[in-house]
UniProtKB/Swiss-Prot annotation:
One of its GO terms (biological process) is isoleucyl-tRNA aminoacylation. Its EC number is 6.1.1.5. Its cofactor is Zn(2+). L-isoleucyl-5'-AMP binds at residue 589. It comes from Zymomonas mobilis subsp. mobilis (strain ATCC 31821 / ZM4 / CP4). The keyword Zinc applies. It comes from the Bacteria. ATP binds at residue 633. GO terms for cellular component: cytosol. HAMAP family: Ile_tRNA_synth_type1 (MF_02002). This is Isoleucine--tRNA ligase.
Length: 941
């Protein structure tokens, strides 16, 4: 009777208080938007960045040199992608134990700021050119830049980017301006700079020359014309009195025509069209006749090679205007003339094209400088003088003044419209023209007189340096190589006010610029004291000293191309802070910087030092919306990073960045970020589980690794494999792979497998009779502790806020997780044989799980614990499964292994009773609610 009462009491008892359930105050709901600023404040208070510098002093240094964003406006999603990617790389390199300083910087000179400041003066009814002196204007530009530097600094810090924010580099700092001017002097002293009049890309809106890096291309519709030039003289009698036909997409250049070009090896024909004779390339005759609307016969009167046209002379269609227009137009042989389009004869205006300029120069034909800096022909020009902008569609239209005048004299044969790509200013978006103006250039193909690359050219030095740099992705090398091979000399002068001046004095008699180190030293000393404003307010005689008279020298009024500014950052940031000769390990920017910062930095460093300023270059793509479209406010598909941060937190943005294949263009939308948030929640919940599961864990509880059960050893094997793969991903900057590997390990190997199997041990292998738990439970928690230390570090470079939150939750007095180094993962944990064995076990477990699931849905079994499975396997698989408790691994009541040739897999509901504490269905449980042997043991029953 007493035994019966004891059994009844056992069954009736509530065993829940004896079961360990993971408990933690770590919130499931992240609340990142509120939590992250608190963590930022902690980092600021503890000066985490400086702690790292002190801790890593003497360690291997890794310099990721920051390409300067422009100090104008709030940050956009492209900025966020760039800065977060940089921070992930720097934090991961820091995790490897390296000293990774980060000096953020800003590009502060240039047109966008000038425009904004000009607007401010206009609102005050002031004319910038007449009412404001250069120094006053520059000071206002400086104030404007300071405002946006301060604004963007706070926005970048909110992304979690760690750096020397209190001491950034600015291209407008006095020391920076002095060093930029000093870099220019290196080029001038070695004879690499020259002044020349040649066609450069010119913005009539901004009234300045632009470099290739400042040019965007957009499709436009242009008026094209077929135009006849009368041939007045030739050694081929048939040609005299006939007409050479040219085709052009720029009618506005005709008023400056100086010659006609032919291809020496091209076949030409003179044809009779209704009594008039016209010269075309034979290969383009059919297309040309269609364009001018000729449908009848076209008898060939003469056929010959272009070389035979040498010495022929034509007259300008507007020759009756006299003067310039009455001068003869010679035929010139040009290798650039092809039969790809047009007529095979090209009109030459040396003011408005590189090929035109070079061919005419070779024949002593000079440009005429007919178009002013505002894009209008000079008022004294005999045709089109003082009329509208040459880029105006009205000027170039078929019914515009140029075409109308040419039609009136009978020279215009046809007009049409061509849809094609055309250069535009990347800032104003206005169409550009080629315009011949006096500019300052850095020569690419002139052998250097002295210095680091004496006897070599800048182009050959740069191309050699490209081969010595690591490019990520590899295609970046081909891209910049092609650009450097084909680019013209670098035009470094700008006709503006806000920038570093070209600190040269030109001899008024010889035209040579002064190369005197003493003069240069005085200039640089003044710049260090009062900035580049010194050039604009100086008594230049003080700079020249006693050796030279100001009346003999003209100070240059142009400023430097801003790309020379940013191209010099390796000098005034990297070398200035870390020692002369120091090179950055990495430059990282968008793919457009192959023609921008990567290239200007390469040319500047190669010209002054003979090598690239970087060891490796990594590029990322542009940000597009979820459908692959460019973001546009008018379309309404812009993602504002600040809004995302305020709603979801910076860690969501950081995880999105890491998840992308940023070597290509990347997509972002609300839907994309929603998917990122789902992935984040899974990782966060796994950390929450670890914190709860490790509650109360102590060193005394640890089990020697040699004594771990096989499953735990297998998990450590997977961890060792993961560790190696993550390390490789860091070194290859492959963070999308890094995040995928980390997420897959946590979600698939841990949450869905290891944690699932071992939750019974965690919950139920501890009690009053076993306060520290069984050996198996302690082994599990030992591995959980190893996993925690590894995973929180692995996550830290990407989820910098969440990793800190997790770490401090468990170790509130341990300092920042970002002060720790890469986890110590023993390579001996790798066990290929064990890995192969457990791959088989997991494969069979998956088969069992998939077979049970339909029965759970149909409520034939309530959970897998109620299932008995008959599993047919071959002998080799049976041996593997028999070596482990496969029922425990499948979380089932029982697994019966049978020969593979027998029946198919079956699942039945077990007849075993359910333990009242652990809920397992086991043979020793006498009836539902009674305890199994294990539970009796740990609770002391």
């Amino acid at each position: 009777m007493s035994d019966q009462k004891s059994a009844d009491a056992t069954q009736a008892r509530d065993w829940r208080p004896t079961v360990f359930l993971p408990k933690t105050s770590f919130p499931m709901k992240a609340g990142l938007a509120k939590k992250e600023p608190e963590i930022l404040a902690r980092w600021q208070k503890e000066d985490l960045y400086q702690q790292l510098r002190e801790q890593r002093k003497g360690a291997e240094r890794f310099i990721l040199h920051d390409g300067p964003p422009y100090a104008n406006g709030d940050i956009h999603i492209g900025h966020a992608l760039n800065k977060i990617l940089k921070d992930i790389i720097m934090r991961s390199q820091t995790l490897l134990g390296k000293d990774v300083p980060y000096i953020p910087g800003w590009d502060c000179h240039g047109l966008p700021i000038e425009w904004k400041v000009e607007e401010q003066f206009r609102k005050k009814k002031l004319n910038v050119d007449k009412d404001v002196n250069a120094v006053e204007f520059r000071q206002e530009c400086r104030k404007y830049a300071v405002h946006w530097v301060d604004t963007q600094r706070q926005e970048f810090k909110r992304l979690g980017v760690l750096g020397e924010w209190d001491n950034p580099y600015l291209t407008m700092n006095f020391e920076a301006e002095a060093i930029i001017a000093g870099e220019l002097m290196r080029f001038s002293e070695t004879g690499q700079i020259y002044r020349g009049a040649k066609p450069v890309l010119w913005s009539v809106v901004e009234k300045t020359a632009l470099a290739e890096a400042e040019v965007d291309y957009a499709d436009v519709d242009s008026t094209t014309i077929d135009l006849a030039f009368k041939i007045t003289d030739s050694k081929i009698p048939e040609l005299v009195g006939g007409y050479a036909v040219i085709w052009t997409t720029t009618p506005w250049t005709i008023p400056a025509n100086r010659a006609l070009a032919y291809g020496p090896d091209i076949d030409y024909v003179l044809v009779d069209l209704n009594g008039k004779h016209y010269l075309f390339a034979e290969a383009l005759l059919e297309d040309s006749l269609k364009r001018i609307g000729h449908e009848g016969d076209a008898p060939v009167l003469w056929r010959g090679k272009g070389a035979e046209l040498d010495g022929s002379i034509a007259q300008h269609p507007m020759f009756e205007k006299g003067g310039f227009f009455a001068e003869p137009r010679p035929f010139l042989g040009g290798s650039h003339v092809t039969t790809e389009a047009g007529t095979g004869i090209v009109h030459m205006a040396p003011d408005y094209g590189e090929d035109d300029f070079l061919l005419c120069k070779a024949h002593n034909i000079d440009p005429v400088f007919a178009v002013e800096d505002d894009g209008r022909y000079r008022k004294d020009w005999l045709w089109m003088g003082g009329e509208g902008l040459v880029i105006s569609p009205k000027i170039n239209a078929a019914d515009g003044p140029i075409c109308s005048d040419l039609r009136e004299v009978g020279a215009l044969l046809a007009t049409s419209v061509l849809h094609h790509s055309y250069p535009h200013s990347w800032r104003s978006k206005a169409k550009l023209i080629y315009r011949c103006t006096p500019q300052w250039f850095i020569a690419l193909d002139r052998p250097v007189e002295k210095g680091a690359i004496a006897g070599k050219t800048l182009r050959e030095t740069a191309l050699k340096a490209i081969d010595e740099v690591s490019w990520f992705p590899a295609k970046g090398k081909n891209r910049i190589q092609t650009m450097v091979e084909g680019r013209p000399d670098w035009v470094i002068s700008r006709q503006r006010a806000w920038g570093v001046p070209i600190t040269l004095y030109v001899n008024r008699e010889s035209g040579d610029y002064l190369r005197d180190p003493e003069v240069n030293a005085r200039i640089l000393a003044a710049f260090r004291k009062e900035g580049a404003d010194a050039w604009f307010k100086a008594n230049h005689q003080l700079f020249l000293g006693d050796k030279y008279r100001l009346e003999d020298y003209e100070p240059v009024n142009d400023i430097l191309d801003v790309w020379f500014d940013s191209g010099s950052t390796h000098a005034f940031v990297v070398e200035a802070r870390y020692g002369e000769g120091t090179r950055a390990q990495l430059y990282l920017e968008g793919s457009d910087q192959h023609r921008g910062w990567f290239q200007s930095s390469l040319l500047e460093s190669c010209g002054s030092r003979g090598h690239a300023p970087y060891e490796a270059v990594l590029t990322h793509g542009f940000t597009l919306d979820g459908t692959g479209r460019k973001m546009s406010k008018s379309v309404g598909n812009v993602i504002d990073p600040l809004k995302v941060i305020n709603e979801s937190g910076a860690d969501i943005l950081r995880m999105w960045v890491a998840s992308t294949d940023y070597n290509e263009d990347v997509r972002i939308s609300k839907e994309v970020l929603s998917g990122t948030s789902d992935g984040y929640r899974k990782l966060r919940n796994s950390f929450r589980y670890l914190l709860g599961a490790l509650e109360g864990f102590s060193e005394e509880e640890k089990v020697d690794l040699a004594d771990l059960p096989e499953l735990e050893k297998y998990i450590l094997h997977l961890l060792a494999e993961l560790d190696q793969a993550l390390h490789e991903s860091v070194n290859g900057f492959a963070f999308n792979r890094y995040l995928r590997l980390l997420s897959d390990f946590v979600n698939n190997d841990l949450s869905a497998f290891f944690f699932d199997i071992r939750k019974d041990r965690l919950y139920c292998d501890v009690g009053e009779a076993a306060p520290q738990g069984t050996e198996e439970r302690r082994a599990y928690r030992t591995v959980l502790d190893i996993l925690f230390h590894a995973l929180v570090r692995y996550a830290a470079p990407i989820l910098c806020f969440t990793a800190e939150e997790v770490w401090l939750h468990r170790f509130p007095d341990a300092g920042s997780v970002h002060l720790s180094v890469w986890p110590e993962v023993d390579g001996q944990w790798k066990n290929a044989v064990l890995g192969e064995k457990w791959a088989v076990i997991r494969e069979q477990r998956q088969i069992v799980t998939e077979k049970i699931e339909p029965l759970r849905r149909e409520k034939i079994v309530g959970s897998s614990l109620e299932a008995e499975v008959t599993l047919p396997v071959d002998a080799a698989t049976a041996k593997i499964l028999s070596s482990v408790d496969f029922s425990e691994i499948c979380i089932t009541a029982k697994i019966n292994l049978v020969d593979a040739s027998d029946a198919a897999i079956t699942v039945d509901r077990t007849q075993n009773h359910k333990c009242g504490r652990c809920w397992q269905h086991l043979p020793e449980v006498e009836e539902d609610g009674a305890l199994c042997d294990r539970c009796k043991s740990v609770v002391g029953e």
